[in-house]
């Protein structure tokens, strides 16, 4: 009897041990695969469905939750070398009754990458306009959100297509003339003088460089296991040549100050969110936008770096939700007057 009981525990223990060993082996040997599983799980948990749309031969990949309703739909544009899933932390805290759309920017993740594509800000705005038309998002004005590179694209889109945009949230956007030069922009100047475009801090190729990039982008010091860092690098390395091409297009004269050159054409109510300790794009950019956009709402987050959406997802979601609610309240008052 005792032997039977012992065997039962051994069988039970073995049953539990097999998946545990499989997990440990996967973690050690295929960390990139586990990162993909992680995003798949959170998309599923949050009700974000992966979808595709086409404009001619060009394919867009995006995630969506909900359907268009009385409130404006929300389109979210990620930053350089990121992807649609970077918004998941913020999506978790957004109201379930909002129609959300997070698209992979041109050349990123599941969206087409073409050698013939023009990756300047104007080129990306054109592609995002095609995406908007392909899913019929512009049937009525929508709220547009963008961070970093995506903020640059969002701002220029709002300037060029004012009738499409009900309101705008720019999170530490690129494309401005910043009164104070950031740590990253200083590093960039040194690289430009030397003619070295292989050591761009935002394009890491080792786990150590990945750690340096995270320290540059984030005020919060996340404790990330070495295997996860390696997984992140394994995911990025096949795309680094594209990221380099894209980066050079973004810092070219035609794109570097695109938002600055177009900000006076933005008509939509605008919200600006910036991390006070941003080392990539200095927070002084918020003053530049506030000086040009009449009545815009500025939110500066203490103890927060460039990766606002990753560092402060709950706060970012609340600020955007409150902003949208205040606009709806203003519209309701106008209707009753």
From Swiss-Prot:
Q: Name one GO cellular component term.
A: late endosome membrane
Q: Which residues face the membrane's Cytoplasmic side?
A: 43-337
Name where it's found.
Answer: Late endosome membrane; Lysosome membrane; Mitochondrion membrane
Q: Does the keyword Transit peptide apply?
A: no
Give the positions the UniProt entry annotates as the active site: 148, 278, 306
Instruction: Note the topology in the membrane.
Output: Single-pass type II membrane protein
Give the stretches traversing the membrane.
Answer: 20-42
InterPro entries, alphabetized? AB_hydrolase_1 (IPR000073), AB_hydrolase_fold (IPR029058), AB_hydrolase_sf (IPR050266)
What Enzyme Commission number(s) appear in the record? 3.1.1.23
Tell me one Pfam family matched here.
Abhydrolase_1
Example of a GO MF term = monoacylglycerol lipase activity
Any GO BP annotation: monoacylglycerol catabolic process
Membrane-side (Extracellular) residue stretches: 1-19
Protein keywords? Endosome, Hydrolase, Lipid metabolism, Lysosome, Membrane, Mitochondrion, Signal-anchor, Transmembrane, Transmembrane helix
What catalytic activity does the UniProt entry give for this protein?
A: Hydrolyzes glycerol monoesters of long-chain fatty acids; 1-octanoylglycerol + H2O = octanoate + glycerol + H(+); 1-decanoylglycerol + H2O = decanoate + glycerol + H(+); 1-dodecanoylglycerol + H2O = dodecanoate + glycerol + H(+)
- Protein role: Lipase that preferentially hydrolysis medium-chain saturated monoacylglycerols including 2-arachidonoylglycerol. Through 2-arachidonoylglycerol degradation may regulate endocannabinoid signaling pathways. Also has a lysophosphatidyl lipase activity with a preference for lysophosphatidylglycerol among other lysophospholipids. Also able to degrade bis(monoacylglycero)phosphate (BMP) and constitutes the major enzyme for BMP catabolism.
Q: What name goes with this protein?
A: Monoacylglycerol lipase abhd6-B
**What is the name of the gene encoding this protein?**
abhd6-b
């Amino acid at each position: 009897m005792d032997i039977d009981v012992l065997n039962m525990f051994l069988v039970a223990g073995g049953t539990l041990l097999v998946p545990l060993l499989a997990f440990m082996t996967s973690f050690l040997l295929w960390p990139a695969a586990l990162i993909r599983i992680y995003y798949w799980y959170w998309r599923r948990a949050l009700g974000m469905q992966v979808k595709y749309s086409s404009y001619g031969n060009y394919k867009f990949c995006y995630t969506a939750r909900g359907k268009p309703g009385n409130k404006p739909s929300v389109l979210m544009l990620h930053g350089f070398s990121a992807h649609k899933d970077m918004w998941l932390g913020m999506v978790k805290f957004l109201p379930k009754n909002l129609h959300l759309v997070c698209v992979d920017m041109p050349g990123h993740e599941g969206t087409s990458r073409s050698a013939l594509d023009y990756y300047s800000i104007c080129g990306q705005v054109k592609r995002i306009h095609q995406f908007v038309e392909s899913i019929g998002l512009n049937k009525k004005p929508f709220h547009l959100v963008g961070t970093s590179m995506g903020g640059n694209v969002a701002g220029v889109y709002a300037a060029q297509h004012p009738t499409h945009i009900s309101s705008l949230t720019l999170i530490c956007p690129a494309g401005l003339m910043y009164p104070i030069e950031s740590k990253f922009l200083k590093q960039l100047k040194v690289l430009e003088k030397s003619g070295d475009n292989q050591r761009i801090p935002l394009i890491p190729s080792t786990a150590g460089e990945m750690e340096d990039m995270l320290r540059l982008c984030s005020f919060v010091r996340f404790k990330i296991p070495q295997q996860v860092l390696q997984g992140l690098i394994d995911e990025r390395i096949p795309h680094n040549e594209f990221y380099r091409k894209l980066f050079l297009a973004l810092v070219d004269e035609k794109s570097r100050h695109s938002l600055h050159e177009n900000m006076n054409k933005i008509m939509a109510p605008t919200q600006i969110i910036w991390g006070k300790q941003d080392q990539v794009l200095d927070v002084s950019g918020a003053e530049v936008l506030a000086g040009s956009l009449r009545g815009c709402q500025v939110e500066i987050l203490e103890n927060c770096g460039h990766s606002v959406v990753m560092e402060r997802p709950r706060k970012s979601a609340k600020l955007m939700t409150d902003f949208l609610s205040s606009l709806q309240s203003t519209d309701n008052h106008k209707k009753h007057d």
